[in-house]
Amino acid sequence: MADDFSPEGQLAQAIPGFKPREPQRQMAHAVAHAIDKAQPLVVEAGTGTGKTYAYLAPALRAKKKVIISTGSKALQDQLYSRDLPTVAKALKYKGRLALLKGRSNYLCLERLEQQALAGGDLPVQTLSDVIILRSWANQTEEGDISTCASVPEDSPAWPLVTSTNDNCLGSDCPLYKDCFVVKARKTAMDADVVVVNHHLFLADMVVKDSGFGELIPEADVMIFDEAHQLPDIASQYFGQSLSSRQLQDLAKDFTIAYRTELKDTQQLQKCADRLAQSAQDFRLQLGEPGYRGNLRELLADKNIQRALLLLDDALELCYDVAKLSLGRSALLDAAFERATLYRGRLKRLKEINQPGFSYWYECTSRHFTLALTPLTVADKFKEVMAQKPGSWIFTSATLSVNDDLHHFTERLGIEEAESLLLPSPFDYEKQALLCVPRNLPLPNQPGAARHLAAMLKPMIEANNGRCFMLCTSHAMMRDLAEQFRATMTLPVLLQGETSKGQLLQQFVSAGNALLVATSSFWEGVDVRGDTLSLVIIDKLPFTSPDDPLLKARMEDCRLRGGDPFDEVQLPDAVITLKQGVGRLIRDVTDRGVLVICDNRLVMRPYGATFLASLPPAPRTRDIKRAVRFLANPTAE
């Protein structure tokens, strides 16, 4: 099998520009062995190893049923439309390939029909999008909403015309036989290789999320790319949550049922209005948006208790009213089941004294989520692996801390796995420079953003933009963008002003832009060549100590006799930093400077752990040296 990766192998012969790499060959060997012996394997493969081909080739050669799961939909689409067909063609693979996304990624024909019938109540632009979608529904074969270019991805129409596990009518749906989810699932059941994402994999394994039985078909090989995201995503699925969005969707379905099928039951409209209003009132009690807080502490507040009681009563009323009309409308019957489910969830969320969970809430400008999350998913994930014997393969560029994979395997309860650490083949000694500038402002001192922007401006201008400024908070992101826009003539792009895809397009086409962003640009973004040669990180990405989930994990670690900083905070921050750093050098010809604006990297003992986990680039504290490197990378 390793011959596929030799200079004369199948891949080199069939793929233009394919260059064999030793780490890639080693990884392919390990994957083939793990599949052959049906055992778990954990591989950290540094950027540029070519890990995608390294797991695809042996997986296709094995002639078994394979599931490949990614952390992001972007990588999922790239795998299915680019990498998988390329390797399959090179190896003359004859098996069937399928792409499967979560239910809410497909147009729901029944909900589209309901919205068109109740259309008079929609805002003009939303109604216009619904009309466009009716015509698109007749043209699309898959119903995958990411392929619809005529309606913007942030249109309010999308949540109205896609279904969730909560509101899908399942086999009771009048349009069941034309359902895009059913078709996608059938294709996946019949396929030999299915590309999914972690959310869908876990939803199906844990929640059995579908009215159709198991979505993820029986497989012999499970491969997780971007596996560093798995522990956090798994904790969502092993917990419970209830959001105002779910409650308002429920209220909307009550309204549609009343206006289309049950016009004689006016109570439906009344209880829908009351539910929507009480959800809105509860959100207003929560105060400022963008904050994640402790639900146990929140529920001690008398005003919150009162608002929650009214929300509880409104949900109870919906349940009672829907119960009286059961059997008269498939839509209302499904809504009744959701009302029952949400009553149960709200009751569980109010039982805040159960140990082993973090109880938290967060709110955006219009919505809120109440949630409980288990402090550890190791035992649960171990059960999931035991239920599905076969090869479990986990890979990412960022799994280790200080060359040790223990933090990752322990969080998921992975035992007796083979492990492999493959360094990046890039020559960081020549291709990159790490700069931790002198005289940095303290992170929380007044005017920190102004001071930092003034310090970084000469470097960004000397590089003619072509820079990512990655921030650890939204506040710092906005403050820095404001400072840069006031003092520079280069285009300054800001995350949130348009979609992620459009921002990246603007960044690449401008050729001299500065992109100021936060967490969503720390990973899964691939900009090669001269377009990006400077990455600046505002500070070490420790999660806020006020984050209730982090607090609870630290407390749990303390109770078990561990050191919360060394075992929880530090490893999480190291892995996040490695992701951000990975944006800079994406190819053997790339050159660039990485700037980390945090003295702790060189002044605190734990800085050594961060540095040991970063690529081995030369280091400096002199901004002028960094500017010289950018002007003439080969002279260093």
Predicted regions and their residues:
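A substrate-engagement module of RecA-like helicase motors
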Residues: 1-14, 47, 64-192, 199, ...
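Conserved pre-motif I regulatory segment
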Residues: 1-43, 57
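Walker A/P-loop NTP-binding motif
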Residues: 32-33, 52-65, 82-86
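Signature of the SF2 helicase/ATPase Hel1-core->accessory helical subdomain module
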Residues: 61, 77, 82-85, 165-166, ...
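Conserved RecA-like ASCE P-loop NTPase motor core of nucleic-acid helicases/translocases
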Residues: 66-72, 394-395, 465-472, 595-597
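A contiguous, basic/glycine-rich beta-loop/short-helix subdomain that forms a polymer-engagement track
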Residues: 159-194, 205-212, 317-440, 447-454, ...
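Conserved RecA-like P-loop NTPase helicase motor core
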Residues: 437-447, 497-602
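Conserved helicase motor "Helicase C" RecA-like lobe of SF1/SF2 P-loop NTPases
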Residues: 472-496
